[in-house]
Amino acid sequence: MIVFGWAVFLASRSLGQGLLLTLEEHIAHFLGTGGATTTMGNSCICRDDSGTDDSVDTQQQQAENSAVPTADTRSQPRDPVRPPRRGRGPHEPRRKKQNVDGLVLDTLAVIRTLVDNDQEPPYSMITLHEMAETDEGWLDVVQSLIRVIPLEDPLGPAVITLLLDECPLPTKDALQKLTEILNLNGEVACQDSSHPAKHRNTSAVLGCLAEKLAGPASIGLLSPGILEYLLQCLKLQSHPTVMLFALIALEKFAQTSENKLTISESSISDRLVTLESWANDPDYLKRQVGFCAQWSLDNLFLKEGRQLTYEKVNLSSIRAMLNSNDVSEYLKISPHGLEARCDASSFESVRCTFCVDAGVWYYEVTVVTSGVMQIGWATRDSKFLNHEGYGIGDDEYSCAYDGCRQLIWYNARSKPHIHPCWKEGDTVGFLLDLNEKQMIFFLNGNQLPPEKQVFSSTVSGFFAAASFMSYQQCEFNFGAKPFKYPPSMKFSTFNDYAFLTAEEKIILPRHRRLALLKQVSIRENCCSLCCDEVADTQLKPCGHSDLCMDCALQLETCPLCRKEIVSRIRQISHIS
């Protein structure tokens, strides 16, 4: 929800300000006046009342008064056609620009309040984005993120990702300058070990850039010094949160095949084998490190002779789990199918394997990270729009509990609840009563009033479901082990009634799944949509015949020519 609303605002705001600037120029020409003009709203503001220490205006005045053009263009806007955007939000009081550190901390303070797509981004986010439109400003923003984001704030790394993801792409010169400023190597990783926030933030920045610049730019960014720095951060002497984000950064660098080969040659798998033993550690920071280490060993940095986790995990008592075939593309799911984590910049979602249509049902979630997650119930009609920021609770077919922002979500609208913010180790309970048509949410056994809005759109076909913001993780209990806070009323559990075959329980690593896809052969006469059934149906009046009858019955227009389908004729009979 946050990312999509922020992107829409920037697009509309840039267009509106360009039109207003053009209008001002024509008015000034018509009246025969010059100089600064005053406008209202969130467009350009008058220089006379914008503050004498406005650094952007000062730079522009110096450039205009200079008789000799400067050869250094790093402080100039990257898009000279687009007018400068100096507007504040329409409700923001006029004030002098703060320093970058203050703006970053302001953004961190208000990030929990950004909940709706039509909500104005705060002044701090707008200003930071404007600063980052030049190389010099972008470098200032990045250094500030490393310098001031505190270790203890659970949304700190997510704010780093959010701000960098929405800033303009850095130029090659800016990236080169950043590597020179940071000057990272193994020795730097050992410095300031008593202040791990700087190293955590540095790794988070590197990971975000690696994800955003996958390809040649990512290869150039992973210098020998940066690789040495990240590997040094994985040593057991490091703070667990530093280890976690160094590992995530290496994962994101490995999205580029050349980087993956370089990292694999560093014997990283030997270090990860030690760290994967933390996957069930009672310390929730170490547990995150263990989860990511195990996932990397299974999916990215394979170790010769090591058995993949899915081949040895005991699933005999598990009859319901997270569905690896009903999940957005970047969510990580554990081999036992009951734990999930998101390290992408998108809003990743998943449903479980079991659907309920009647009765009273209950499941629990253990909070591993205390950031933004929307967990609850969803039908098959609920859509996963991860890149647009929509997840569970963001349509009329789902309802979700958000313990970080203390909200209940339904149909992309939120309302506050009275529970305190959740924290690591908390247990959230989810009760679905289809007899009374109500949902009840619990935090450590304390229940909220029932929620009934979703039943105006649907009354059956519910799955347990969840959506995750960046760097969030939780564990699900569908009844395979005793609940910590079972409700007083009689209920059923997924694990008592669900059934999965041994094959359906397997959650394959991505390289194994890709290998299976490469082995799939598609017949010449198969349906062009499902690639499963024989293409035996002709559409009228257009005459196209590349579909099976099952797919043709679901269409109103031909997918090839877009003509309306009047009738469907089966051409041949076949044995499926």
UniProtKB/Swiss-Prot annotation:
Regions of compositional bias (Polar residues) in chain numbering: 57-68
GO BP term, pick one: proteolysis involved in protein catabolic process
Glycosylated residues, chain numbering: N314
ZnF locations on chain (RING-type): 527-562
Annotated spans, Disordered: 50-99
Compartment list: Secreted
Record key words, sorted: Glycoprotein, Metal-binding, Phosphoprotein, Secreted, Signal, Zinc, Zinc-finger
Residues bearing the modification Phosphoserine: S50
Annotated Basic residues bias: 83-97
Signal sequence annotation: 1-16
Domain B30.2/SPRY: start-end pairs: 300-483
Protein name from the UniProt record: RING finger and SPRY domain-containing protein 1
Organism, as annotated: Pongo abelii (Sumatran orangutan)
